From Swiss-Prot:
Residues 168-335 form the OBG-type G domain. InterPro entries: G_OBG, GTP-bd, NOG1_N, NOG1_Rossman_fold_dom, NOG_C, P-loop_NTPase. One of its GO terms (biological process) is ribosome biogenesis. Residues 509-518 have a biased composition (Basic and acidic residues). It comes from Encephalitozoon cuniculi (strain GB-M1). Residues 519-528 have a biased composition (Basic residues). CDD domains: NOG. GO terms for molecular function: GTP binding. It is found in: Nucleus, Nucleolus. The gene is NOG1. GTP binds at residues 174-181, 220-224, 287-290. This is Nucleolar GTP-binding protein 1. Residues 470-528 are annotated as: Disordered. Gene3D superfamilies: 1.20.120.1190, P-loop containing nucleotide triphosphate hydrolases. Involved in the biogenesis of the 60S ribosomal subunit.
């Protein structure tokens, strides 16, 4: 079970609550009404505003009531933690005040909606609406101190550590400045502040680590002083609450060197005081063994009688001695205890008879298959397989040097042989590269003439198939020559000569020249 209070919605202050609710009402309801409207429409207009305002106030206050946890519904550890940090009575009174204001606003909304049903004019409806919103705002304004307190509680609760109360847990406790935070930093990933003065840790810190492929959490608690319960402050009560409610292996730290400022007798007395809160799973850690160990004490009769029958181990965080051993001892102790508790539980006894151990069938060993292989009569000598002269065959020469085969460069006559090969190739070159002329000069001239004739006929056929005139010219009459564009063939591209442009109408008014169209309009008008 893990509680996380970061989901709580921020609590608005009283004036913020009024501004939010009234602005939402103004935005989400109609805003224009006239006296000449029907009285039923006027009543519905103002009833809608009063209802919406009441719902806005009630929903905002209801969110506060549902988000904050009820002490009776959460784990006792968190219930006592809220009591220590925020005072249980003050916390419940604040939520009760918010609930009373919510009920009062809902009552005001219903009351004024009923009065608006009997209003007989626009003026009376408006005054009833103002009275309703005023009473709602007054009820919200009275929540000023309460909402401030709840916002502080919310901000503090969101910073509380997330502790898995049913998980595997190690709990570290003891006097201030005995080395608890240093141990937590060594075995986990928690960034706990470590300082040479006492009461450095003022709240609960949670670190996580892995042991035997399981996830573990270690809780660092503030230092505790040996004094009556009613005299303990809030910081000490955090440790007392954790010891009382969290099922874990308790690591009680004792500083034998007394550099923490407290004697060994005081630390043993504190252990006896906390003994009712400690479980049977407990390990006493003798810290700062690099300063003074158990063997270096002069009078160790009292401490030995105290440690009799208890699990203990010396440890030094400065020199990192026995840190893993202490962690392993505590973790194994908790694993054994959890295993025994599950075995002895009544719930398991109902199903223990149904559990069967299933083992896989043992397979018979396969007989070796008969493999027919050739018998090796002699060991071949790798040296004899190479084509190397007898006098060089058994020399110890590497095969590969600098990525090159040594045998390629081993022949002393290689240059002479290369020269002979090149001369032989030069002698064979004329024989293989000789060209033969098959045609005589007369036959070659005749061939060229035939090829030229074929090409000439191909060009003539292509020009014959080409159209002499465009298709658009075939359907034009001879008397419409003024509209025919003049085509000029130049560089095998057809260019269209545009007719001369006529002057604009504005310029024609000031010109003596007159331009007539090819078809006058008055001849084709149809009626004079």
């Amino acid at each position: 079970m893990k509680a996380n209070f970061g989901y709580i919605t921020p609590v608005p202050l009283n004036m913020e609550l009024i501004d939010i609710s009234l602005s939402k009402t103004q935005k989400r309801t109609p805003t224009v009404i006239h006296p000449q409207y029907n009285i039923v429409k006027i009543r519905m207009f103002y009833m809608r505003k009063v209802k919406h305002a009441g719902n806005e106030f009630a929903s905002r206050l209801g969110t506060i009531l549902t988000d904050f946890p009820r002490i009776e519904d959460i784990h006792p550890f968190y219930g006592d933690l809220i009591n220590v940090l925020y005072d249980r009575d003050h916390y419940k009174l604040a939520l009760g005040h918010v609930n009373a204001a919510k009920n009062g606003i809902e009552k005001v909304s219903k009351e004024f909606v009923k009065l608006l049903k009997f209003a007989d004019s626009l003026y009376r409806c408006k005054q009833l609406k103002r009275a309703a919103l005023g009473r709602m705002a007054s009820a919200a304004k009275k929540l000023g101190k309460t909402l401030e307190y709840l916002e502080e509680v919310r901000m503090h609760m969101s910073r509380l550590p997330s502790i898995d109360l049913s998980g595997r847990t190690l709990l570290v406790c003891g006097f201030p400045n005995v080395g608890k935070s240093s141990f937590v930093r060594k075995i986990s990933r928690a960034d706990v502040e470590v300082q040479p003065y006492p009461f450095t840790t003022k709240s609960l810190y949670v670190g996580h680590f892995d042991y035997k492929y399981l996830q573990w959490q270690v809780i660092d608690t503030p230092g505790i002083l040996d004094q009556p319960l009613e005299n303990r402050n809030t910081i000490e009560m955090l440790s007392i609450t954790a010891l009382a409610h969290i099922k874990a292996v308790v690591l009680y730290f004792i500083d034998l060197s007394e550099t923490c400022g407290y004697s060994v007798e005081e630390q043993m007395d504190l252990f006896n005081t906390l003994n009712p809160l400690l479980s049977s799973n407990m390990v006493i850690v003798l810290s700062k063994s690099d300063v003074l160990g158990l063997s270096g004490m002069e009078d160790k009769k009292a401490i030995m009688s105290f440690l009799e029958g208890k699990k203990y181990m010396e440890m030094s965080c400065e020199k990192e001695e026995n840190i893993d051993a202490v962690k392993a001892m505590a973790c194994d102790l908790l694993l054994d205890e959890r295993f025994e508790r599950k075995i002895n539980s009544e719930r398991l006894s109902e199903y223990i008879n149904r559990i069967t151990i299933v083992r896989p069938k043992e397979l018979r060993e396969k007989a070796e298959s008969f493999i027919c292989s050739r018998e090796v009569t002699e060991i071949e000598n790798e040296q004899e397989r190479y084509l190397i002269p007898e006098e060089y065959r058994y020399d110890i020469v590497p095969e590969i040097v600098d990525g090159k085969n040594v045998a390629d460069f081993f022949d002393p006559d290689i240059e002479k042989k290369l020269k002979e090969v090149e001369e032989e190739e030069e002698g064979l070159l004329p024989m293989y590269c000789k060209t033969y002329d098959v045609l005589s000069p007369e036959e070659r001239a005749l061939k060229e003439e035939v090829v030229a004739g074929i090409e000439r006929r191909r060009i003539i056929n292509r020009l014959r198939e080409k159209k002499r005139l465009p298709d658009s010219w075939k359907h034009r009459s001879r008397n419409s020559g003024g509209d025919i564009a003049v085509h000029v063939r130049r560089d095998s591209k057809t260019q269209v000569a545009q007719p001369p442009r006529l002057p604009s109408k504005k310029k024609a008014r000031f010109d003596d020249k007159h331009y007539y169209d090819r078809k006058p309009k008055h001849l084709y008008r149809g009626r004079k």
